UniProtKB/Swiss-Prot annotation:
GO biological process assignments: NAD biosynthetic process
Family designation: Belongs to the NadD family.
Protein name: Probable nicotinate-nucleotide adenylyltransferase
Taxonomic lineage of the native organism: Bacteria, Pseudomonadati, Bacteroidota, Cytophagia, Cytophagales
GO molecular function: ATP binding; nicotinate-nucleotide adenylyltransferase activity
InterPro entries associated with the record: Cyt_trans-like, NadD/NMNAT, Rossmann-like_a/b/a_fold
Pfam family, one: CTP_transf_like
Record's function text: Catalyzes the reversible adenylation of nicotinate mononucleotide (NaMN) to nicotinic acid adenine dinucleotide (NaAD).
Length: 192
């Protein structure tokens, strides 16, 4: 199987993440999309990051009804901070029967040369890139292992959602019903 790995904090997972995953699953040659919950992003501050298992629960709830989606906690047991190259190596060794593609936003492509061992990633894996606001035209767009995928340009931010929760405002339509129920019942983000 050909699997797209969609890494993220998913703090929380929102409809933008689901739309991108569905677009990748339905309009490319991918058989599945795995949402890889990152315990810690080396490029992001850790202040308002929910515990990894809580974020994994939200991802699992959000994607439960799509047979082409899978939630992965594979990075939880790997050394922190999590570097994509290390996870890709680990996951490829663990599942040699599959081929893997990295799903990233155009904003990440702009910063890709800052990633640990980015040349190794580009040599061994394809990048399926979806559009993001305020992205520049990275020279990597022309790389043979980079594929630009037409997808809706969405400006939904997890920070915005967390702020709404803190202000006790509705997050309906920004997250799935299942995720909204988890956030409200477990009081996620209320005091961040």
């Amino acid at each position: 199987m050909k699997i797209g790995l969609f890494f993220g904090s998913f703090n929380p997972i929102h409809v933008g993440h689901l739309i991108i995953g569905n677009t990748m699953a339905e309009t490319t040659d991918l058989d599945e999309v795995w949402y890889v919950v990152s315990p810690q992003n080396p490029f992001k501050k850790n202040q308002s990051l929910l515990h990894e298992f809580d974020r994994f629960d939200m991802v699992t709830a959000a994607i439960a009804n799509n047979p082409k989606f899978r939630a992965s906690d594979i990075e939880f047991s790997l050394p922190k901070p999590s570097y994509t190259v290390d996870t890709l190596t680990y996951i490829s060794d663990k599942y040699p029967q599959h081929s893997f593609v990295l799903i990233i936003g155009e904003d990440n492509l702009d910063q890709f040369t800052n990633w640990k061992n980015h040349e190794q990633i580009l040599h061994h894996y394809s990048l399926y890139v979806y559009p993001r606001p305020d992205s520049s035209n990275s020279f990597l767009r022309e790389h043979k292992n980079v594929r630009l995928v037409a997808a809706p340009l969405l400006e939904i931010s997890a920070t915005y959602i967390r702020n709404l929760v803190k202000q006790e405002k509705s997050i309906r339509y920004l997250v799935s019903k299942e995720v909204e129920e988890l956030i409200l019942s477990r009081k996620y983000y209320s005091n961040y």
